[in-house]
């Protein structure tokens, strides 16, 4: 939308400029035409005045008066002489005296009498005009070319012309000679790494002799402790060891439950004293 508005405004501005230029050209052309018309009228008036002036001079020449006297009689001024008395004796061979001071300016002369009427002109001729008389103006032969006039003012700049047509393509020129080898240029920047190529074919197994064994490498660092091993199998029963020393007497156990009543005993023998139990030895 903004582009359309800007384009419309630009088109209106260009149209206004073109219209102003066209109006200026039209006005300038009208002024030149009016100037030519005025100069033509002035030339005609000048011709008429020259003819009239020549006629007046011819009339005065017929009366015995020169043209210079006639002009002075019209445009000149008759000075009045100062009233002086000429009663003295006239000079006889005396040298001329010094020039006197300029006299006072005279009074303006009065209006001269009107000139006499000119002679009556010849009566005009009544020339019949035939019907087949050409209505166009009579073309007089061209006079000698006049002097060059003053250079005119610089005209307005014309409107831009249309774009010229595209010319035909020219012929290919002859190949030029091989030029000299130029100076070595600066090394270019490193290119970008290329794309990965397709996988190559499988290589052939070499048939060379085995090489000499290399030197043993340095011992590597100590590894981490291994995991605990599985429990070993139960070993065979060993030989019986020597008899250990008798242990300490244990604590008396709890009384057992009373047993069942035994059968009735047989009649015992006559009463006798039971033998005493043996005395136990204390072990250290």
Curated annotation (Swiss-Prot):
Gene Ontology terms: biological process: collagen and cuticulin-based cuticle development; cuticle development involved in collagen and cuticulin-based cuticle molting cycle; post-embryonic body morphogenesis
Biased composition (Low complexity): 181-193, 224-246, 255-271
Bias (Gly residues): 106-115
Basic and acidic residues: compositionally biased ranges: 163-177
First and last residue of the signal peptide: none
Entry function: Nematode cuticles are composed largely of collagen-like proteins. The cuticle functions both as an exoskeleton and as a barrier to protect the worm from its environment.
Summary of subunit composition and partner proteins: Collagen polypeptide chains are complexed within the cuticle by disulfide bonds and other types of covalent cross-links.
Protein name: Cuticle collagen dpy-5
Organism: Caenorhabditis elegans
Lineage: Eukaryota, Metazoa, Ecdysozoa, Nematoda, Chromadorea
């Amino acid at each position: 939308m903004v582009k359309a508005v800007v384009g419309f405004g630009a088109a209106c501005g260009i149209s206004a400029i073109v219209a102003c230029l066209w109006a200026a050209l039209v006005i300038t052309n009208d002024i030149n035409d009016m100037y030519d018309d005025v100069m033509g009228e002035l030339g005609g008036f000048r011709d008429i005045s020259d003819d009239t002036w020549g006629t007046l001079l011819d009339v005065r020449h017929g009366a015995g008066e020169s043209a210079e006297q006639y002009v002075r009689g019209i445009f000149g001024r008759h000075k009045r002489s100062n009233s002086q008395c000429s009663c003295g004796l006239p000079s006889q061979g005396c040298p001329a005296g010094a020039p006197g001071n300029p006299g006072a300016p005279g009074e303006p002369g009065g209006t001269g009498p009107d000139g006499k009427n000119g002679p009556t002109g010849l009566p005009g001729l009544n020339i019949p005009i035939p019907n087949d008389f050409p209505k166009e103006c009579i073309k007089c032969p061209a006079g000698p070319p006049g002097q060059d006039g003053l250079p005119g003012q610089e005209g307005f700049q014309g409107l831009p012309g249309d774009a010229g047509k595209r010319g035909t393509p020219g012929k290919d020129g002859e190949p030029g000679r091989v030029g000299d080898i130029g100076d070595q240029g600066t090394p270019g920047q490193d290119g970008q790494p290329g794309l990965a190529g397709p996988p190559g074919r499988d290589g052939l197994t070499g048939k060379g002799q085995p090489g000499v064994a290399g030197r043993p490498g340095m011992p590597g660092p100590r590894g981490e402790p291994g995991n605990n091993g599985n429990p070993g199998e139960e070993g065979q029963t060993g030989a019986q060891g020597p008899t250990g020393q008798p242990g300490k007497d244990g604590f008396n156990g709890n009384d057992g439950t009373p047993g069942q009543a035994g059968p009735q005993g047989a009649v015992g023998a006559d009463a006798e004293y039971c033998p005493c139990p043996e005395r136990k030895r204390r072990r250290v």
